[in-house]
Amino acid sequence: MTASIGSEADLCHWLVNYLVTNIGCTPDEVDLNLSLTDLGMSSRDAVVLSGELTDLLGKTVSPIDFWEHPTINALAAYLIAPAPDPESESAPRRSVQGALEEPIAVIGMGCRFPGGISGPEALWQFLCDRRSSIGQVPNERWELFDDGSPEVKALLARTTRWGSFLEDIDAFDSEFFEISPSEADKMDPQQRLLLEVAWEALEHAGISSNSLRRSQTGVFAGSCLSEYGAIASTDLSQVDGWSNTGGAMSIIANRLSYFLDLRGPSVAVDTACSSSLVAIHLACQSLRTADANLAIAAGVNLLLSPAVFRGFDQVGALSPTGCCRAFDAAADGFVRGEGAGVVVLKRLTDAQRDGDRVLAIIRGSAVNQDGRSNGLMAPNPAAQVAVLRTAYANAAMPPTAIDYVETHGTGTLLGDPIEARALGAVLGRGRAEDSPLLIGAVKTNLGHLEAAAGIAGFIK
């Protein structure tokens, strides 16, 4: 330590002067809690500054330190602090022996679904009222794609317009989430929506954001498409430094981890309409292996373009009547929908220790793939039977003990019978006549939320 730098305040003052002199900041622009990147420091600048600090402090300073401690205050505190004891660098890790079967507690939930649904209680009331949120696509959604030509107008007129849509998807409080208006404008609204609903889920769990900083909290977010990224990049003159992160699928999870300063896994999951359930599965596994001590699992889906509607129309998948009739002889296809759902998960023993409200318990889950079936998009009955058996085995639950299943239930003439047969093969055998298996499908109320479909059923 040099004589001129004896405290954090001294180093903060030196860093401010350095930024003003070498990076071009004005003193008024330098916020001690703003990231160095936001203050204009590039990777090349970081290399130069690390050399200056190494000479100044008489110890090695790496450019990586600026990313691990990204603000002036954080960097100064790190560089002035005594060297840590190597044995205390990492917290003691939980033994995983015997933990792989530990139940997982659901301690918080949040959701935003069509029909004015802004939380789990509102969803339950919506279902009890036997309501449906399905309607016509808002006119402004497809205006961008109508170039005025007769050909395009004819194509749009022949495209299914039924869906389940959220209102005000362009509304976002960027200041609350510490995002500039310019960056927010380039963000996929799915990123914005997930930030909002995740915050609500943490509030529902009674967890403050400050308590999560630098914690081993994982984020697992299901999403399928970033139509916004494709739309926003069609005009090259409007592409800027925020465009890549604004439209990247990986950032849907990473954005939340960044905002809350979470240090656990941060994974975007795309397995089509199972995305959010696979996200929950991965979150549970992460908790059981102690990669995370708390996990946020989510799914989000918005419908911004007529292109996917048209693609589904070409194979006759969408309902021309605008009804998602699950397990109904009159089923004529599914209805696409929007929404977001988030659950906060914790090991049951930890939740009980901490006095958390336990809303539900996940005892087991399983994931597989159809493999070679009757076409790339065709379900495989044998694979469905196998994944059900594995899930109940992992949960140590006899199938005959199950009295209700929230199904996929898309309302398609092929998918629903295959799912019903698989359920019957696994859950129907050996069942007493006075112990029927009840099934349901939230898609009849909300439509098929695709990447958020599984978590909508889970929250129900």
Predicted features and spans:
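Phosphopantetheine-dependent thiolation modules in NRPS/PKS and related acyl-activating systems
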Residues: 2-94
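Condensing-enzyme catalytic core of the thiolase-fold
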Residues: 101-460
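Internal signal-anchor transmembrane helix that establishes type II topology
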Residues: 96-100
